[in-house]
Amino acid sequence: MLIQGDASALEWRCASFLSQDEVASKEIWNDVDQHSDNQNRFGLPSRLIAKTFVFRLIYGGSAYSYANDPNFAEVSKSEKFWDKVIEEFYLKYKGLHRWHIKLMQEATSTRKVCLPTGRIYEFEPTIRNGQKVFPRTTILNYPVQGLGADLMTIARVSLFNRMKGKFTDAKLVNTVHDSIIIDCDDKHTDELSQMMLDVFEDVPKNFQKLFGVEFNLPMKAEVQIGNNWKGMEVWS
């Protein structure tokens, strides 16, 4: 039996934690479907479009990139339209906006960005038309992806330690971005599925133990089970 644990909204939680955005944090704590709210708030045609828009923006998306993306062509090819949506996004998530500005200032002045986990990213500018240009999308992307990788490592090591010696016929077989996969005997499905949920929920506690910093957001996961990766169903 395969058991797959998917971290819920991993990148959004990482961006919300790093920016300490109050609105995003409240939405996470209150289980608000922020993508549906943003769809209505920003006048976008679907939840999926709203979700894609948000994740591109936290990685440095621009009005030009949205207006010239075929996937957004049916929404609008107008940069003015997307400028307005971006403005409304940052008005809602003011903390995220301030963090984006701070990241760029930090990266351009020190040429590096440091994370609470000890990761250090260094950035070198390129020269365009005699001007130094720093890679904005990379600067905004790396901290979120890096913290996500660290949180997944905490969950993975915790799961391995809990399984060790107790489930001799169960193995950690794969990790795919925000997912952890176990292969086990059917008789252990329920116990290991619950364990999978527990290790994700315990990530904030273990984060503070490891790094001495409070991770002040909850972590959650969805667990799926199946005899093969194609036929997974939600475990409950």
Sequence positions of predicted segments:
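Conserved catalytic core of nucleotide polymerization and phosphodiester-bond processing enzymes
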Residues: 1-236
